[in-house]
Amino acid sequence: MKIVIADDHAVVRTGFSMILNYQEDMEVVATAADGVEAYQKVLEHRPDVLILDLSMPPGESGLIATSKISESFPDTKILILTMFDDEEYLFHVLKSGAKGYILKNSPDEQLILAVRTVYQGETYVDMKLTTSLVNEFVNQSQTDEVSSSSDPFKILSKRELEILPLIAKGYGNKDIAEKLFVSVKTVEAHKTHIMTKLNLKSKPELVEYALKKKLLEF
């Protein structure tokens, strides 16, 4: 099987490549350092499996890349690399098209098993993350049942519409302030208004919302 590895740390790309290339049925055909490059490598090589770091540089997050790549290349199975502090993102990435999750500090044998599992079209989730994932699924299902049919997106101001995709892409308040020539306090105020108006509770929910509204493009 052909594999592409996307991670912003060179040591991870190199280490995982060595482990997987040692397997007779696996070949790492390319690596990438961010979401944009990952998309380009998948377009070029059409791999069977993409191993994708969830925590990517600002503007090219793993959550955004997962949605874009799974939509454009449904035959490429996406295996997410994650850390414990990324647990809140797991349910959202699953909804975006990922086939599995594995912790970066997992043993080599577990990585190999995860790759083979998603390659076969099955879902692989690290046991340490399963409870968190199930709880998030239950909470999200309950939220969906009581969600309003009205669209609060229409009441966002022009400035809030500018700031929303930047927040979703991972830019910090200072970076956004510099881009839009406003103060950091202004950005913080707009961010609060956006979260309140859209009834969003976390950054992953905001990213998912931005993806649904097609506000994020490579």
Curated annotation (Swiss-Prot):
Residue ranges constituting the HTH luxR-type domain according to the UniProt record: 149-214
Organism expressing this protein natively: Staphylococcus epidermidis (strain ATCC 35984 / DSM 28319 / BCRC 17069 / CCUG 31568 / BM 3577 / RP62A)
Lineage, opening ranks: Bacteria, Bacillati, Bacillota, Bacilli, Bacillales
Domain (Response regulatory) ranges: 2-119
Tagged with keyword Transcription: yes
The entry's keywords: Activator, Cytoplasm, DNA-binding, Phosphoprotein, Transcription, Transcription regulation, Two-component regulatory system
Predominant subcellular localization, coarse grouping: cytoplasm
Superkingdom of the organism of origin: Bacteria
Function: Member of the two-component regulatory system NreB/NreC involved in the control of dissimilatory nitrate/nitrite reduction in response to oxygen. Phosphorylated NreC binds to a GC-rich palindromic sequence at the promoters of the nitrate (narGHJI) and nitrite (nir) reductase operons, as well as the putative nitrate transporter gene narT, and activates their expression.
UniProt xrefs under Pfam families: GerE, Response_reg
UniProt modification remark: Phosphorylated by NreB.
Modified residues (4-aspartylphosphate): 53
GO biological process: phosphorelay signal transduction system; regulation of DNA-templated transcription
Record feature DNA-binding region, as residue ranges: 173-192
Classification via SMART domains: HTH_LUXR, REC
GO molecular function, one term: DNA binding
Name assigned to this protein: Oxygen regulatory protein NreC
Subcellular location: Cytoplasm
Gene Ontology CC terms: cytoplasm
